[in-house]
Amino acid sequence: MDKLTEVLNLAKSKGYFWPSYEIYGGVSGFYTIGPMGSLVLKNIEDLWKSYFVRPNGFLEIDSPDIMPARVLKASGHVDNFKDPMAECAKCGSKYRADHLLSDSGIQVSESTSINQMNELLNQNKVKCPNCGATTWTVKQFLNMFETNIGPYADNKGYLRPETAQGIFVEFKTLLDINRGKVPMGIAQIGRGYRNEISPRQSMIRLREFHMMELELFMDPEDEKAPALDRDMKLPLLHEKVMEKGEPELISPYGAYKNGILKSAWLAYFLEKSFKFVMALGVPESKQRFIEKLVGERAHYSAQTFDHEVFFDEMGWTEVAGFAYRTDYDLKSHAKETGQELVVIEKKTISTRKTIKLNEKEVKNTHKKDWESIISSVPESREDGIYCAGIKLSSNEYKIIEEVEKEEVRKFVPYVVEPSFGLDRLLLATIYYAYGKKDGRNILSLPDVILGKVVAVLPLVSKKDMIEKAFEIKAMLEKSGYFVIFDEKGYIGKRYARLDEAGIPKAITVDGQTLEDGTVTIRDRDTWNQKRIRPSDLLV
Amino acid sequence: MDKLTEVLNLAKSKGYFWPSYEIYGGVSGFYTIGPMGSLVLKNIEDLWKSYFVRPNGFLEIDSPDIMPARVLKASGHVDNFKDPMAECAKCGSKYRADHLLSDSGIQVSESTSINQMNELLNQNKVKCPNCGATTWTVKQFLNMFETNIGPYADNKGYLRPETAQGIFVEFKTLLDINRGKVPMGIAQIGRGYRNEISPRQSMIRLREFHMMELELFMDPEDEKAPALDRDMKLPLLHEKVMEKGEPELISPYGAYKNGILKSAWLAYFLEKSFKFVMALGVPESKQRFIEKLVGERAHYSAQTFDHEVFFDEMGWTEVAGFAYRTDYDLKSHAKETGQELVVIEKKTISTRKTIKLNEKEVKNTHKKDWESIISSVPESREDGIYCAGIKLSSNEYKIIEEVEKEEVRKFVPYVVEPSFGLDRLLLATIYYAYGKKDGRNILSLPDVILGKVVAVLPLVSKKDMIEKAFEIKAMLEKSGYFVIFDEKGYIGKRYARLDEAGIPKAITVDGQTLEDGTVTIRDRDTWNQKRIRPSDLLV
């Protein structure tokens, strides 16, 4: 059994996640996150916020899953969010055309056209996996879930393909709440939907998934990005080194300065992402960033990098995408709605002085030259004000100071978007936490992911010990711990069960507990035990 | 302007929530939760868990929004989750038939039939709000959002009308994870969808909403519910007092013992709910529980109580429902799938002794009576074993102990379900927090709802003060605070803005801060200020 299969089995038996609707024979592309998975998911979300949201004073929103068709028409999804679908002429089975081809060893890329795929399938006589026939028709399949809003048949809606559009359509209100200022970061954690033609690969190609997205709105002429790291190195498989196939190790600062990354915010987010995924337990060497070239990128993106994690069984697998969306989305919605979606920047121009002549006085003083004085522009010299080369006395002019003048600049902000697949991160986290010790499975999840989870175990099933254990359980639950209570079986077996489930600490209540109140605490990874007071856990 | 309108205006301008898609002209029944609303929502969720999930060791899961049609056919939703829809014969406008009638002053209840509504609308010549015509056709409208899963046209799906079904279909796996034990509580916080015919009432009738549900599975013959409160009083408008229209004040214990509540868990959850909604800031006197009578209840429920909160503008409004679903759902899914969805309870029968005679020895010892001894049943008396009235010596018999015998009992567990509408709770929380002080608006949200939010304000816009303020901001953000940074405008105006937004504390950085590091901290509700060190906030 390969590691991934072992991990998926463990994920089900220990309550992390499993394919939904199994009693109904299963429906591809849907997973249920179980009790342990829910705890981990919340902690991954919180860790993500500590990297991407909180340090920059960004905001978080929660917008609907259902979107009116007009919004997604304007955003370009109705026209572009499609996959090539091959239909077997004989049995009518439907597949992803590009997957059929690559499974048959025929190279395709994200820029291969529908017609090309049609030809390739038919000319190479690729067999239908269902009936063996070799005649195919390829067309585009819109992979958004369609529905109808309300009772009128013409009111079409879609389930959002990304949370981002729920942010773009609320840009105006959000900018008001942020008091007109950019850079403004708006995060959203929620579900995305993609009506895959024939999903495979368990947690990787889901029809319904969890996303964490951040739309960073900024002034393209003055990005105001945080300082970039000049020392750390990111493995970037960017356009210029793509042919070699090996990532270049380069600092975020260098990659931005050299023009490899088109935005300083993009560089900043790649840096953050690398550290974030490391904190989940994925080693540096199992991460890389790969640039998506023209034709591979989404329709809205001027530059895209995918953050990939390596799995032995699946190779490099995307866990996050970073798109430089520019002003594409705001402009599209502005055009469709006729609304102005802009930042209004008011600049104060520095103090300006103007000299105004007192014409009456000039006429009285300069009987001869007054006309040439009045018709020329006064000039300020070190020793006074001159006009037509003649020095004026102070009663002949007034200096008017315009102290403030506002200059208004309107612009459509540019957007950089980090977008994370939460289910894939969950899988990667468990995959890299999974290991063996003395032939037993251990799920060594990082503390930041499962810190506040603890098991409480009465050593033997005696009434007073169970009561004491319940007392400790209640105390820990009051302090926000998630407590697993397990009173059955040999203690060694219970420890083994907990190690495999990833529970970081186990507290055992024994005879001595009844005497002096102390318990043993056992560590999942080292198997070390020591006696403590239960309240020591709370500090 | 009434209070509700004021609250809704504030909710938008301060970033709590607002109607979605406004730049597209709006789509009824959809709301976006803004930055402040997201913070509050998370805290309401966490508070709910501290009442309903953590204290009992319950589990939480996260299942898909999209469900295959077969699941919701089995659950009874496809046949029952419908509203009466009246269509105008002239202009084709569609409305909730019962709303049209009650708006015209004609009494209907949840048990009035389609045919009755049809007659009532036409006979009373109720006018179409759109064109004024008076001819109607009433039919049932299925209010689930329908979609198609994958590329095959016959693979229908629905957006879940409740999170509960995602729990019921995973019951088998969840019971395994819980090691076969009931009571087992499974919570889910997520979205629900209801394709309303013509939603009105802002946050009350949403087409997409946030729910918090708990399915409590238990043995109906031995509920094992926690101890019920005998002292607190709940206002129950139950069946027996419904006609009087006034709730009876009765303890959860009393209501269960008197048969007003059919399950002890139901009584326990009502008690919890009352305390929970009080913690959100809704006074006792603005809460009640009302029983839903036959015909008003959902198809799956043997007893339902709604938890209602009073709004001046809308009257009593449901924020939660408590349904005694019995074994309805598990039986329905078991029937449809042929799977056994049961709890298997293994009982150990108490130790049993049997006495076996050593016939050879008996024959040797009792030459005369051995036949009558062997043919009778041995009897255990205080002083030894007798057979046919004769005391036997210890070599004449053996006592065989059957130490353990397992008795297996299978049963379909019963379910009690608390189900909360999170959006309505959010509205109620803000509504009851909203008030005035010296003519100014204050949103006095309870600390538990917005505790870790703070504003940091440099007194004047000077470089060193702003830098110091940023330092304090970073420190607070590191400790998990959500920090609002506001450097513009007179300090009094800034305080007023923060009071209205509900921000509990404001920290002001002034000249003295630059000298000794102290700041002033100002309280939203009392307007009191005192000097502290910023690190004092963290303890």
Give the role of each language-model region:
Chain A
Residues 1-539:
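NTP/phosphate- and nucleic-acid-binding module
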